[in-house]
């Protein structure tokens, strides 16, 4: 599917040949004398159309319009949230076999973020998973034209939106694949395909190299599986070599049975989505390759399965992480933090400006925040503010959670430097406190996407989040023209 941006008035849109012409009608719509304006004004006057987001009126082959079908679509304030809500009402239309060309015309100047919301809505709504289906109909929609009053002014937002859409789709594709079609090796191969883009490099380490690095926690999780682990290292070089990179670390558990601490059978199939963090890193690099921002980024993906086996790690086992710290594994189903802790230690070799890890880490975060916002934990206030702002801009929001030092008390162990779990209470926070022990003084953030990486039920499938958040964050960093002094790490202290 291709997107294109054109300067297109309502008068010109009437002559545009397509299968579906969507006219976004905002509050305070001011009609002109053209046929589409007249049609819209008449529908509003008669009460057949409301400007409330998502309210629509379908017209088939109206006189003077070249499109086969016209939809007048209310979009309220025409901001990003309203446009997304409006476009979601049209999602079924984007999958119709008869709809191959769509034109989307803004009835007024688009507010900031509205174009991105429209592009993402069309991309998400038309997405079709086909990788393991023999009779699936491929995506019918081939071309989407966005008509705006001034295409030149809208071009930067449009470029970002289409790149993010491509990245989100790449992430969804790999997170959706069944575990036997997305093994650690296959995920690593997907990362290698990104190296075809200018500025992107990829290196993959196997069990032997990982063992030499001393990644005992990562190795412990992988030892119960016949599928060999992979440590993927992606690099995007868009700035001078002297510029410190941002390191993204994505949890890559390609299937999580829980190990010896076996999960319940119900909905265990959804544990193929446990590599949502890894998929988001792949998606971010797909977008970076298209946007080519002036920034250096490293992506790390520790990929393996968590399986029960005679060789599997057992509750009570003590392992030595790459950092040298020992860990008592009280629950083998708390494996994500084990693979991440070694990858976070490895990240230090790049002398990063900031580290952000992304993981479907805890059910506790789902309980706390549901499926709307990802959980954000950060050791640095400025980094937290940047990620919160990026999430809002991308309509991919997160919510900052506490990191009081007292939450780490439950990680104490009689037999190791720390345990890998600290009980049920505050589970998402104690998991973040565990990870914090492996990042030193580097500005660090942890995104718990357990509630946002996929949807269950009839709409089961990966969402591609938080690719949008991360891309917007990186683009904002890239726009900073001067190198700011390194921010001092600030942990939240107890208020008691």
From Swiss-Prot:
Intracellular or extracellular location(s): Cytoplasm
Keyword field contains Ribosomal protein: no
CC terms in the record's Gene Ontology section: cytoplasm
Record keywords: Aminopeptidase, Cytoplasm, Hydrolase, Manganese, Metal-binding, Protease
GO molecular function, one term: metalloaminopeptidase activity
GO biological process: proteolysis
Binding site for Mn(2+) 1: 256, 333, 335
InterPro entries: Leucine_aapep/pepB, Macro_dom-like, Peptidase_M17_C, Peptidase_M17_leu_NH2_pept, Peptidase_M17_N
Cofactor: Mn(2+)
Superkingdom of the source species: Bacteria
Main location: cytoplasm
Residues reported in the UniProt entry to bind Mn(2+) 2: 251, 256, 274, 335
Active site positions: 263, 337
Alphabetical list of PANTHER family matching this protein: CYTOSOL AMINOPEPTIDASE, LEUCINE AMINOPEPTIDASE-RELATED
HAMAP family found in the cross-reference section: Cytosol_peptidase_M17
Chain's role: Presumably involved in the processing and regular turnover of intracellular proteins. Catalyzes the removal of unsubstituted N-terminal amino acids from various peptides.
Protein name: Probable cytosol aminopeptidase
Organism: Acidovorax ebreus (strain TPSY)
């Amino acid at each position: 599917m291709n997107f294109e941006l054109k300067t297109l008035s309502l008068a010109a849109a009437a002559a545009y040949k397509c299968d579906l012409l969507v006219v976004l009608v905002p509050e305070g719509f001011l009609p002109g004398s053209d046929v589409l304006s007249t049609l819209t004004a008449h529908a509003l006057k008669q009460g057949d159309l409301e400007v409330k987001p998502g309210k629509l009126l379908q017209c088939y082959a109206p006189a003077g319009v070249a499109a086969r079908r016209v939809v007048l679509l209310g979009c309220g304030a025409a901001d990003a949230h309203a446009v997304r809500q409006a476009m979601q009402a049209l999602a079924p239309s984007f999958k119709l076999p008869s709809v191959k060309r769509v034109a989307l015309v803004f009835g007024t100047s688009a507010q900031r973020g509205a174009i991105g919301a429209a592009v993402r809505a069309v991309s998400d709504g038309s997405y079709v998973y086909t990788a393991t289906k023999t009779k699936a109909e491929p995506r019918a929609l081939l071309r989407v034209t966005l008509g705006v009053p001034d295409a030149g002014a809208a071009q930067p937002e449009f470029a970002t939106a289409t790149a993010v859409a491509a990245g989100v789709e790449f992430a969804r594709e790999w997170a959706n694949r069944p575990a036997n079609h997305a093994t650690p090796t296959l995920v690593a191969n997907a990362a290698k395909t990104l190296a075809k883009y200018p500025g992107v490099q990829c290196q993959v380490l196997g069990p032997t190299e990982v063992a030499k690095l001393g990644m005992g926690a990562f190795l412990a999780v992988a030892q119960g599986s016949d599928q060999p682990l992979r440590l993927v290292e992606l690099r995007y070089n868009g700035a001078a070599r002297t510029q410190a990179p941002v390191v993204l670390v994505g949890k890559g558990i390609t299937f999580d049975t829980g190990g010896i601490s076996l999960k319940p059978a119900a909905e265990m199939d959804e544990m193929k989505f446990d590599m949502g963090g890894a998929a988001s890193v792949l998606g971010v690099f797909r977008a970076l390759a298209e946007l080519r921002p002036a920034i250096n980024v490293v992506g790390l993906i520790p990929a393996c399965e968590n399986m029960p086996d005679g060789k599997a790690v057992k509750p009570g086992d003590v392992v030595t992480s790459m950092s040298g710290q020992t860990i008592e594994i009280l629950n083998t189903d708390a494996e994500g933090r084990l693979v991440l802790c070694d990858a976070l230690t490895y990240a230090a070799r790049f002398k990063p400006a900031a580290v952000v890890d992304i993981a479907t880490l805890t059910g506790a975060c789902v309980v706390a925040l549901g499926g709307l916002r990802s959980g954000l934990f950060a050791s640095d206030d400025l980094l937290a503010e940047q990620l919160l702002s990026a999430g809002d801009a991308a309509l991919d929001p997160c919510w900052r959670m506490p990191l009081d030092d007292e939450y780490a008390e439950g990680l104490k162990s009689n037999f190791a430097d720390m345990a890998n779990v600290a009980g049920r209470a505050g589970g998402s926070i104690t998991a973040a406190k565990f990870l914090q022990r492996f990042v030193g003084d580097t500005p660090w953030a942890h995104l718990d996407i357990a509630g946002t990486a996929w949807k269950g039920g009839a709409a089961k499938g990966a969402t591609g989040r938080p690719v949008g958040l991360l891309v917007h964050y990186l683009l904002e960093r890239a726009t900073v023209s001067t190198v700011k002094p390194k921010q001092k790490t600030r942990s939240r202290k107890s208020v008691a």
